[in-house]
A protein has these predicted regions:
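N-terminal loops that bind phosphate or other acidic moieties
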Residues: 1-201
Length: 201
């Protein structure tokens, strides 16, 4: 079970990591999307930071559901509902007492929810191309550093992909050669979580 101080640190680290990478996410999205992913994600996680004390006072499952609600309300675009679904589903599936397998199982359920919401599969140049390999790494017993490394490798692996879902799919072949911004923001979140468990890349 995460104590209140550690839960607060976890939420804050994830939020600040995403906010600090606003420009990078904007640049990635400008190449193959609307160019608003960085600003949208920043707005969502600033709303999370504004509620930090209240969020950290809740049990972990309730915290994650509340974070998801904030992201749905504040992020907008395609990413808001997808990240909101991810966090809310994690909140529904995670027990209060964590171990690697329970996290892997909860992430698997959350991925299924994101897949249904976004009508996407792996290989289509989306956040799923990071989340699915991360879940597999967790399920295989990988430590936090290895999970974070896998997230970053998976985000890089979207560069040669042709987008077939989302705004980037309108570009067809021209989407090749660019990292998917949603994959990158997913990797940032995974890396931030991993760093809170004592190991960073």
């Amino acid at each position: 079970m995460l104590g209140q101080a550690r839960l607060r640190s976890l939420i804050e680290t994830v939020a600040r990591t995403v906010i600090e990478h606003e420009d990078e996410l904007t640049q990635l999205d400008s190449a193959i999307g609307d160019g608003d992913h960085g600003a949208n994600m920043k707005r969502g996680f600033e709303a999370v930071l504004a509620e930090l004390d209240a969020l950290a006072a809740k049990p972990l499952p309730e915290t994650l559901k509340a974070v998801g609600t904030q992201l749905v309300m504040k992020v907008g675009g395609a990413s808001g509902p997808l990240y909101g679904t991810l966090f809310m589903s994690l909140g529904k599936s995670l027990p209060e007492t964590l171990d690697r397998q329970s996290v892997a199982q909860a992430l698997d359920a959350a991925i299924a929810a994101v897949r249904a919401r976004g009508k996407a599969e792996t290989g289509q140049k989306t956040m799923l191309d990071v989340l699915v390999p991360v879940q597999r790494a967790l399920a295989s017993g990988a430590d936090p550093a290895a999970v974070a490394a896998r997230a970053n490798e998976a985000a890089e692996a979207t560069i040669p992909m042709k987008a077939t879902r989302g705004r980037a799919s309108f570009l067809g072949e021209r989407s090749i050669g660019h990292m998917d911004p949603g994959a990158r923001s997913s990797a940032l979140i995974v890396e931030a979580v991993a760093s809170c468990f004592g190991i960073s890349t």
